[in-house]
Amino acid sequence: MPCFLPKITIFVPDHTDRNMKKAITLIFLTVLSVLNLSAAEIDSLFSRWEEATGMHRIRLGNELLSFGYDEGLVSEKKSYGRNQSIESEARIYDMMSYYFYINDKLDDALSTALIALPLCEKSGDEQLLGNCINNIGVFYQRKGLFGQAITYMERVYNLDLKAKDKSGMSSTMNSLATLYLATGQPETALSYVLPAIEMERELGDRERLAIRLGLASDIWLEMGQIEKARSCVDEAYKLDHEDKREGNAAIRLSQKASVLIALGEDIEAEKCLI
């Protein structure tokens, strides 16, 4: 599902394709320094908006939305109007939850996103709603609360299905597969990642395909299907190596080493790690 904020992907270093947190944070902080804005000033503006009423609340809301647009937190310049108060407030809370997340304030990010959720549901904007639910799922995962994360990611998946958004579906299925693998449910994980692989073959995104294949390799390995794990990781490495994604290729070699160790080929595994 396309989102006005970058769709955060479940963070597991070996698997995720859209974990943009570090890069976005660097860009974000660079812009802040140029504009001479401090995090404390932004937090203060948000707090004053929450406490304000009437026209003062609208004025502060417009300042927040303008800030979000200037910093790239929203893709369109929005105004806080009386007739769109629910949507405007949903957008502000959702935007600020992401702001807290990229500034490593995970508890604030989650609590703010949970405030945003009922507003997003009332707004009628399914793109905004999908973004909010996705973020909540990621925040729960980052806190190690995998059960709650799965609940929200399943909701995102249903919205992706409704929107017939194959790219979004693939990302969400990758996240769900990662979560189910982490909770000891490899068969369920496999049921998500295999269709995601076929979607990426159809879409032609070689980098995302390699990520899906790498995750599938880990799942097959967990299930004891060593040859299938090897086949997936070999294809993933080939894609990353040919496209000169050195960091990703190194991850694939690490995954391949795990497969080779399971096959008893310790010497070959050691070569992968050199």
Regions found by a protein language model. Name each.
Residues 25-34:
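Bacterial N-terminal signal peptides
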Residues 37-40:
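Boundary at the C-terminal end of the N-terminal hydrophobic targeting segment
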Residues 46-49, 61-62, 69, 73-81, ...:
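Inward-facing hydrophobic residues that define packing positions of alpha-helical scaffold repeats
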Residues 51-52, 82-85, 119-125, 159-165, ...:
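Short coil/turn linkers that connect adjacent helices within long alpha-helical scaffolds
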Residues 62-66, 91-102, 113, 127-142, ...:
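Conserved alpha-helical positions within TPR/SEL1-like repeat arrays
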Residues 76, 80-83, 100, 120, ...:
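Eukaryotic all-alpha helical interaction scaffolds
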